[in-house]
Amino acid sequence: MRRPFKAAAPTKDGPRSNRDIRVPRVQLIDAEGQNRGDVSINDALLLAEEAGLDLVEISPNAVPPVVKILDLGKLKYANQKKAAEARKNQKVIEIKEIKMRPNIDSHDYETKMKAVRRFFEEGDKVKLTLRFRGREMAHMELGMQLLNKVREEVATIAKVEAEPKLEGRQMMMVLAPR
């Protein structure tokens, strides 16, 4: 036996409104914000129609559900504006990478540290990568000393998020701003 295809009901975004509200009685708040009390859904729909506005479900889980007479278009627009504002104010934290060698010169080190501090001021995380070449692999302690020196210098403005670890010929440490 073949079963007929039953498509899922289309889901609407936002609160239920007007005829979508399927309860016999509701708690009504009119357009002026006055609580009209417990009324039938038909009376509430008539009042909304007379006002030229929509009946919108504000609190569906209350008993009876709370509905308000307002302009649904304005409500959706305000919600979109609020969401856009929240997205605009969101800061994406990036991970900036600083590459060094274990036998870095003092001036080069200072230049790299200036960049590290600038990244922390911008609110970004910093991944310090030490690359070992050739026989430098025999002197891992120099790399650890360098990473510890960096850690001490930025201790007031940053915290260690990932302890120094060795991966192949590289030693890495991740720092995050405080």
Swiss-Prot record:
GO molecular function: ribosome binding; translation initiation factor activity
Superkingdom of origin: Bacteria
Compartments (UniProt record): Cytoplasm
InterPro entries assigned to the protein according to its UniProt record, in alphabetical order: T_IF-3_C_sf (IPR036788), T_IF-3_N_sf (IPR036787), Translation_initiation_fac_3 (IPR001288), Translation_initiation_fac_3_C (IPR019815), Translation_initiation_fac_3_N (IPR019814)
Main location: cytoplasm
One annotated GO biological process: ribosome disassembly
Key words, A-Z: Cytoplasm, Initiation factor, Protein biosynthesis
Annotated region (Disordered), positions in chain: 1-20
Task of the protein: IF-3 binds to the 30S ribosomal subunit and shifts the equilibrium between 70S ribosomes and their 50S and 30S subunits in favor of the free subunits, thus enhancing the availability of 30S subunits on which protein synthesis initiation begins.
Family designation: Belongs to the IF-3 family.
Identification of the protein by name: Translation initiation factor IF-3
Species this protein is from: Mesorhizobium japonicum (strain LMG 29417 / CECT 9101 / MAFF 303099)
